[in-house]
């Protein structure tokens, strides 16, 4: 038997893939457009308060006279419960009930009225370990268009689960003009934000979406976020401190705009209204350069 080891064959050069191809992605329909509405996609580390932020921001837009639609993109389907006061059925649940014959559905089967006129939809998601979130988001937008529900909408907010930015749950970026990142002033949150920045920058090569900025949440200070922003080219759009009143609003199944008047909650309401006005006025498209993982370790920390 020969003892000569054969040199392994050179790896095959894989053909380049278009966006949406591959085993973990869904081919996006380039013709599936939302229309004239201002569309924002909200990302951030899991548990950082994206749904709270999205719901309060939706109400702030509605307080400024805008017709708002919030779309929850999470299998937990709890994005809109402070607006609707309940966990509403998901689009996938409703489609399954009619064996995916969408023509049998009415708008009231999957769109639910929320506080101050905000329209609420929970896209839901496939069972754990199966399917792809991109399909769910695509079906949701398709349904909304079929029923002409996007034609009378001024603002759409996609509230996207955790910091998962695979081809599936990055699907809202196909529709958004601006992506917003909710982050706290801590290492784990900023580490996740860096990954999200990288994913959004990759998607921006094929889609209109650009980063709009950071919403600092549940934080007394912003020094670590400020340090990261300066290093990559981001900016902070709003700062919501860690308020007990905001936590209590979730327990009461309501937004901060429905809570009893308290000085700290009034400041939070004004910050949400200011953020909504800023986004409506238009934010500069940002093109940050994400850091390598090891560089974040070197950058962050107390001096």
Curated annotation (Swiss-Prot):
Residues 1-24 are annotated as: Disordered. The keyword Isomerase does not apply. Its cofactor is [4Fe-4S] cluster. Keywords: 4Fe-4S, ATP-binding, Bacteriochlorophyll biosynthesis, Chlorophyll biosynthesis, Iron, Iron-sulfur, Magnesium, Metal-binding, Nucleotide-binding, Oxidoreductase, Photosynthesis. One of its GO terms (biological process) is light-independent bacteriochlorophyll biosynthetic process. It is an enzyme of class 1 (oxidoreductase). The keyword Iron applies. Its EC number is 1.3.7.7. Binds 1 [4Fe-4S] cluster per dimer. Mg(2+) binds at residue 51. One of its GO terms (molecular function) is ATP binding. Pathway: Porphyrin-containing compound metabolism; bacteriochlorophyll biosynthesis (light-independent). It catalyses: chlorophyllide a + oxidized 2[4Fe-4S]-[ferredoxin] + 2 ADP + 2 phosphate = protochlorophyllide a + reduced 2[4Fe-4S]-[ferredoxin] + 2 ATP + 2 H2O. InterPro entries: NifH/chlL_CS, NifH/frxC, P-loop_NTPase, Protochlorophyllide_ATP-bd. ATP binds at residues 47-52, 76, 217-218, 241-243. Belongs to the NifH/BchL/ChlL family. Homodimer. Protochlorophyllide reductase is composed of three subunits; BchL, BchN and BchB. Component of the dark-operative protochlorophyllide reductase (DPOR) that uses Mg-ATP and reduced ferredoxin to reduce ring D of protochlorophyllide (Pchlide) to form chlorophyllide a (Chlide). This reaction is light-independent. The L component serves as a unique electron donor to the NB-component of the complex, and binds Mg-ATP. HAMAP family: ChlL_BchL. This is Light-independent protochlorophyllide reductase iron-sulfur ATP-binding protein. It comes from Rhodospirillum centenum (strain ATCC 51521 / SW). The gene is bchL.
